[in-house]
Amino acid sequence: MASEIHMTGPMCLIESTNGRLMANPEALKILSAITQPMVVVAIVGLYRTGKSYLMNKLAGKKKGFSLGSTVQSHTKGIWMWCVPHPKKPGHILVLLDTEGLGDVEKGDNQNDSWIFALAVLLSSTFVYNSIGTINQQAMDQLYYVTELTHRIRSKSSPDENENEVEDSADFVSFFPDFVWTLRDFSLDLEADGQPLTPDEYLTYSLKLKKGTSQKDETFNLPRLCIRKFFPKKKCFVFDRPVHRRKLAQLEKLQDEELDPEFVQQVADFCSYIFSNSKTKTLSGGIQVNGPRLESLVLTYVNAISSGDLPCMENAVLALAQIENSAAVQKAIAHYEQQMGQKVQLPTESLQELLDLHRDSEREAIEVFIRSSFKDVDHLFQKELAAQLEKKRDDFCKQNQEASSDRCSGLLQVIFSPLEEEVKAGIYSKPGGYRLFVQKLQDLKKKYYEEPRKGIQAEEILQTYLKSKESMTDAILQTDQTLTEKEKEIEVERVKAESAQASAKMLQEMQRKNEQMMEQKERSYQEHLKQLTEKMENDRVQLLKEQERTLALKLQEQEQLLKEGFQKESRIMKNEIQDLQTKMRRRKACTIS
């Protein structure tokens, strides 16, 4: 059942106090209750550039994120607003407004770099907001993008000296789409006398400069990072909404009081975000919902607080630990529910119980497979197998006890009148033994005819008869109509009958052991079958992701080559070859 969203306004998600980042428990609690997939849009930019206004528009509200009207930065840390997605039913739009970068009151670029990195890691669409044109000053202010290789790791590696550039080659596989919003844009969009669209203007602005000087490298570095890390890019330009003096009242003004061009530009921006922003997805096609976003926030913030780099692989593994543990419990609960509905104890045979177990176990494994991911070394599936085996053994024990109780009760009802007759001396007379044996056979027949006695029926009966051997022998010995020879023959007959019953019970016990062993093997094969199918699906999913990444890298390499940047093209070619090698290995590793 979909969870209801009741956020009337934004709430601080990650607090920034004295340069220290902390996750807000109240915001995490809200996330933990949201089960729908999430489209996460984060906006970052210099302070006092109007980021919050755009986010309020995306929320469909005039007020919400604090706009402020002074040169002081209002937003501290990262603020969150979860609203129903206006274009994607069953999805939640999560808006993340961030602390303004470059706030002179902070004087701390370290904090800004972490805010920037967290916005990238948590979002599926990353909006960078700035004032004016994309000139060198704008690029210099975006130096945070060049810091990402020092702030984020894609893979967990025991080698602390692993090349950051090599690690950053994987960024493209999980980084968000990039949108650059240019506010108060007053120039004509053109280059070399030719009109440009905003997207063409962005592409033009990201062109590299040929040369090897320090100045050229400084010019190229942020551009290279944007091109390499964010292959899908979009640009929007916005006219000044009103005269400067009215900017302080922007959230109070009606659209009719704003520049019509600006109103249309904002509408175009919102329409693009609503239609094109993707659901936040992790490696393996795992769609992020509230609890998963909560886990990511905690993992990343805790890593930063402890002096480590936030690592995508670690975050996914931490999330997998939580979800796989829950998947085991969910699977066990399903098994118990199914067995509770289907099983009536005692069952007529062990096989009947094992067949019900097998069906319920298969469904439980399916529940686990659907709910789990990144189960390293299959530890959680092994845990599930162990718990299911214990549950099976518990049901077998309960079945045995239920059968014993049922049979003991039947024996009491059926045979107690006979015992009373023996006590009364009815069979202590000539010919009494034959009467006793006939009555015993009749009662045994009646016992066998009773339904749903279960698997202990024979054992309980034979145990009872054995306990009454002295009584039977006493009646035999006192019967004067029988010769000594006949008595001896009768004793031997009783012994043979008892031995035959014991042999039958032993045979039945061996058959039960064989059934248990066969069931254990079938259980193993069922786990293996479903695991193999999941591994194959995961392999295909990863190959699809790698193919998308490869296509983006090939596109960027071709563009670098076209622009004449041989060195950068060679670096990209090496990344492409590494990725192709991984893909060949994965394709060769067909699960059979």
Swiss-Prot record:
It catalyses: GTP + H2O = GDP + phosphate + H(+); GDP + H2O = GMP + phosphate + H(+). It is an enzyme of class 3 (hydrolase). Residues 590-592 form a propeptide. Its EC number is 3.6.1.-, 3.6.5.-. Residues 1-311 are annotated as: GTPase domain (Globular). The modification Cysteine methyl ester is found at residue 589. The modification Phosphothreonine is found at residue 590. Residues 35-278 form the GB1/RHD3-type G domain. GTP binds at residues 45-52, 67-69, 97-101. The modification Phosphoserine is found at residue 156. GO terms for biological process: cytolysis in another organism; defense response to bacterium; defense response to protozoan; defense response to virus; innate immune response; non-canonical inflammasome complex assembly; positive regulation of pyroptotic inflammatory response. GO terms for molecular function: GDP phosphatase activity; GTP binding; GTPase activity; lipopolysaccharide binding. It is a lipid-anchor. Isoprenylation is required for proper subcellular location. Transmembrane segments: none annotated. Coiled coil: none annotated. One of its GO terms (cellular component) is extracellular region. Keywords: Antiviral defense, Cell membrane, Cytoplasm, Cytoplasmic vesicle, Golgi apparatus, GTP-binding, Hydrolase, Immunity, Innate immunity, Lipoprotein, Membrane, Methylation, Nucleotide-binding, Phosphoprotein, Prenylation, Secreted. A lipid is attached at residue 589 (S-farnesyl cysteine). PANTHER family: GUANYLATE BINDING PROTEIN. Interferon (IFN)-inducible GTPase that plays important roles in innate immunity against a diverse range of bacterial, viral and protozoan pathogens. Hydrolyzes GTP to GMP in two consecutive cleavage reactions: GTP is first hydrolyzed to GDP and then to GMP in a processive manner. Following infection, recruited to the pathogen-containing vacuoles or vacuole-escaped bacteria and promotes both inflammasome assembly and autophagy. Acts as a positive regulator of inflammasome assembly by facilitating the detection of inflammasome ligands from pathogens. This is Guanylate-binding protein 1. It comes from Pongo abelii (Sumatran orangutan).
